[in-house]
């Protein structure tokens, strides 16, 4: 079993913000796999699909970003998951250029409060896909809680497709090093 976790904040107010790229990516994956049902469980919105013979749960914590770990630990404990190999967390990263993604097997929170919350519950060893939202000269909170601008919006579909492909490979291929080599590059978005 795998759990694909997208981080974000619940509610209409936040749904199109940069900070919600994890929710947006999970919703895009659900669309790709034709999953329409979503239910509340583990303080999250949860949907599932059997993909290549393995149960995959798509998971969006509804605790608000800073408390994401409270939700994540519930599903890990319920299914007795090994965070090192059974979960993939997708979230925004201001330190990466917009459109870049980085896959990591472990590490610190990098100042991301959602990741900090998860680490406080399960430790630093879990697979994560960091999605670059760029750093702006303005206030960090204003930037992450701001909506994608027109230029970013034009590239968003292509970025989400890259994230889709990355997650699909992670679900079917066991060689994470090869996947990291392929995707941990500067963005290659067509203009």
From Swiss-Prot:
Active site per UniProt:
19
Task: Please give the superkingdom of this protein's source.
Answer: Bacteria
The record, for InterPro entries, names: Pept_tRNA_hydro (IPR001328), Pept_tRNA_hydro_CS (IPR018171), Pept_tRNA_hydro_sf (IPR036416)
Q: Name one GO cellular component term.
A: cytoplasm
Its primary localisation, in coarse terms, equals: cytoplasm
Keyword RNA-binding in annotation: yes
Where is the protein situated, by its record's location annotation? Answer: Cytoplasm
Molecular function per GO:
peptidyl-tRNA hydrolase activity; tRNA binding
Please name the top-level EC class of this enzyme. hydrolase
- What EC number(s) are associated with this protein in UniProt? 3.1.1.29
GO BP annotations listed: protein quality control for misfolded or incompletely synthesized proteins; rescue of stalled ribosome
Q: Which family does it belong to?
A: Belongs to the PTH family.
Please describe the quaternary structure of this protein. Monomer.
Known function: Hydrolyzes ribosome-free peptidyl-tRNAs (with 1 or more amino acids incorporated), which drop off the ribosome during protein synthesis, or as a result of ribosome stalling. Catalyzes the release of premature peptidyl moieties from peptidyl-tRNA molecules trapped in stalled 50S ribosomal subunits, and thus maintains levels of free tRNAs and 50S ribosomes.
Identify the PANTHER family for this entry.
PEPTIDYL-TRNA HYDROLASE
Name of protein: Peptidyl-tRNA hydrolase
Record the organism.
Answer: Fusobacterium nucleatum subsp. nucleatum (strain ATCC 25586 / DSM 15643 / BCRC 10681 / CIP 101130 / JCM 8532 / KCTC 2640 / LMG 13131 / VPI 4355)
